[in-house]
Amino acid sequence: MLILKTMDDAQLGVLYETCMRRDFPPSERKSLSAILKMKHRGLYDVLGAYRADGVLAAYALLYHPADGRVALLDYLAVEPAFRHAGVGSMLLAQLRAHYADAADVLLIECERPKAAPDETLARKRIRFYTQAGAQLTSVRIWLFDVEYSILVLPCGERIPACDWAEQMLSLYRQMLPKALFEQNVRLIRA
């Protein structure tokens, strides 16, 4: 069993400088100042998943606007010592329960396998999320020079009908300054 706890700014700073720098390439990592700004505005959740002995096993960062019924799973990683032991799946199950009253779905960006530097790893990530109940949508989006496929993970029992492309664009319009959005966010039409 994992215990979900909201991380404070100091914990986030340590997490960012150690874990996030290790777990995510620069092209996929927002700046710490951008994350803190969204967190202070109440739009961003930074959650640690701890074992009963208080050791951090995994973490997740989510963008969740107060007026929306979706949350964007921006980052999820399992500490190296706990990988391949079901910790990531446990965390996803807990995130679904944690957001059940506030969101219908968690939107997930996964690097598109055919565009990824490591196609096998990208396929494994998508398989991890689909095995946890997520559905791969037809939506593809280009964010800051990285091409992503979009998955939808229900927080309840079903996925509501929705224009997921518009949901993603709407989230990024809210998250980014207009000029940054216009320069770095593109929907890819199949």
Each predicted region: which residue ranges?
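Short amphipathic alpha-helix that is part of the acyltransferase structural core
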Residues: M1-A34, Y50, P154, D163, ...
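A conserved beta-strand-loop-helix scaffold within acyl/acetyltransferase catalytic domains
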Residues: E17-T18, P25-P80
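A generic structural signal for beta-strand entry/edge sites
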Residues: G68-V70, V105, V146-Y148
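Short, well-ordered beta-strand segments in beta-rich or mixed alpha/beta enzyme
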Residues: L73-L76, I150-P154
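Conserved acetyl-CoA-binding loop-helix of GNAT-fold acetyltransferases
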Residues: V78, H84-H98
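Conserved GNAT acetyl-CoA-binding A-motif
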Residues: Y99-L121
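Conserved catalytic-core motifs of GNAT/GCN5-like acyltransferases
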Residues: P117-E119, K124-S149
